[in-house]
């Protein structure tokens, strides 16, 4: 039986692991050969020392080798946050996904239940009536027929069951918060990824490049793992094989600045109700932050020339009812009913 202890010792001493060592360590954890104490110790050793790009890439390689894939169009994208930002904000990326799909871009959305917050993507979507435990074929059909499919991480990364209890008991972010956005079961090549801390902007952009992404924006919004309308958003953009960094404020793209308190969410049912309100056309700070993120996603998808153009398309997606129609179709298809 393989042993995680040498890798724990290495990480605890402050020594970085090579990509190969990281993959080996994650293979041990993902195959159920490590105890919860060992998993917790290893994850926290990495967290305290600071995870490296090779360690993240090795961990992703381990996860991808075990995942149940989903078939999606070549131009599909993912819109996802790492979680772990401790903000308790609304489910911005989930709402954004419906708006982007309503604008004509297929979305293969990867997400999980809350691990360090009150309501994760899966919690809110389940509260809306989406069957988050649909199988891979049904999700593929949802993407092709409704424009969006939701892939519940534990269904596609069943090996995660070995580390799930340790993550919940730790109650704080770990390397796994970084891995979710990098382990999309539909192997999308375009991503809008939010991170929980600015030091991860460029490293994750480099990891995405290494993993074959064509276009991606990695964003941090002043305390949020999304683009923000309550402050300045920092972006590391992977475009044409190059990575550039820049900042965006809401005012420069014609959106109102709000206070962080206006973006505070609640439990899953409350967040689901607020999400539905945005798709039904209600004006709010939540709508504005969704418009900003949707505009960026449409730029990443190649559907919009710039952020202002993307925001205009997002407004049209909501106000025409297209985004709401996507939600209704996803609910139907995920529950095996005609769209």
Curated annotation (Swiss-Prot):
GO biological process, one term: L-tryptophan biosynthetic process
Role according to the record: Catalyzes the transfer of the phosphoribosyl group of 5-phosphorylribose-1-pyrophosphate (PRPP) to anthranilate to yield N-(5'-phosphoribosyl)-anthranilate (PRA).
Subunit structure of this chain's protein: Homodimer.
Enzyme Commission number(s) of this protein: 2.4.2.18
SUPFAM superfamilies found in the cross-reference section: Nucleoside phosphorylase/phosphoribosyltransferase catalytic domain, Nucleoside phosphorylase/phosphoribosyltransferase N-terminal domain
Binding residue positions for anthranilate 1: 81, 112
Binding site for Mg(2+) 2: 225-226
Chain residues that bind 5-phospho-alpha-D-ribose 1-diphosphate: 81, 84-85, 89, 91-94, 109-117, 121
Free-text remark on how the cofactor is bound: Binds 2 magnesium ions per monomer.
Organism taxonomic ancestry: Bacteria, Pseudomonadati, Pseudomonadota, Alphaproteobacteria, Hyphomicrobiales
Family under the similarity heading: Belongs to the anthranilate phosphoribosyltransferase family.
Ligand binding (Mg(2+) 1): 93, 226
Gene Ontology CC, one term: cytosol
Keyword field: Amino-acid biosynthesis, Aromatic amino acid biosynthesis, Glycosyltransferase, Magnesium, Metal-binding, Transferase, Tryptophan biosynthesis
Catalysed conversion reaction: N-(5-phospho-beta-D-ribosyl)anthranilate + diphosphate = 5-phospho-alpha-D-ribose 1-diphosphate + anthranilate
Obligatory cofactor(s): Mg(2+)
Organism name: Brucella canis (strain ATCC 23365 / NCTC 10854 / RM-666)
GO molecular function (one): magnesium ion binding
Ligand binding (anthranilate 2): 167
Protein name per the record: Anthranilate phosphoribosyltransferase
A Pfam family reported for this protein in Swiss-Prot or TrEMBL: Glycos_trans_3N
EC class (word): transferase
InterPro entries: Anthranilate_Pribosyl_Tfrase, Glycosyl_Trfase_fam3, Glycosyl_Trfase_fam3_N_dom, Glycosyl_Trfase_fam3_N_dom_sf, Nuc_phospho_transferase
Pathway where it operates: Amino-acid biosynthesis; L-tryptophan biosynthesis; L-tryptophan from chorismate: step 2/5
